[in-house]
Amino acid sequence: GATVVAGGLPAKARNSGAKIASSSVLLFLDADVVLPVDFLEQTFYEMQARALDITSCFITPRSKLRLDKFLHHFANYYMRMTQKFHPHIPGSCIFVKSTLHKTISGFDESLFMAEDHDYLKRAKKMGKFGYLKSYKIPVSVRRLSEEGRIKIALKYIAVELHLLFIGEIRKNIFEYKFGRHFKS
């Protein structure tokens, strides 16, 4: 049984869900994620076996286009290479112990973008992080298709440069749209 909670930007929606959750592990998923059949069982087992407090999977596109595969492979490589000094976590799939979520006061709702990376940065200071090896999470390429692959790649590069040299993103300075496809 699922409960629908008030949404908003991702940080607010995730925090709203976490407030009513009763599990010892929270799982935050994007609305368009389609999980493989035994995904939850295998990933939860791996999280426990490796004693991870916060984790995620690398990503794979739900697309057969070579460019999509390359872009997602590059994103995974970048996440792997920067995890020690500038950690990233795909917001499409985040597992976290509920105690850790509470300890770091959840997601920062004042951030417009990259709230997931900020969340991981704070969580890593208090708990053990690692990427899961058992699965890559299949993610939608809808945004790539709609906005254009080069345009969105350049936008993500601009976001990264902003995070590295200026800081958190608290306004929609990159014309990034959320939740357009799931309005009722």
Model regions and ranges:
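Conserved donor NDP-sugar-binding/catalytic core segment of glycosyltransferases
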Residues: 37-67
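The conserved acidic donor/metal-binding loop of glycosyltransferases
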Residues: 30-34
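Hydrophobic helical membrane-anchoring modules
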Residues: 125-184
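Conserved nucleotide-sugar donor-binding
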Residues: 22-23, 90-104
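Short aromatic/hydrophobic "clamp" motif used to bind/position activated sugar donors
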Residues: 26
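Short, flexible, basic/aromatic active-site loop/helix in glycosyltransferases
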Residues: 56-91
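Glycine-rich, basic loop-to-helix element that forms the pyrophosphate-binding segment
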Residues: 5-21
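Acidic donor-binding loop at a coil-to-helix junction in glycosyltransferase catalytic cores
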Residues: 113-119
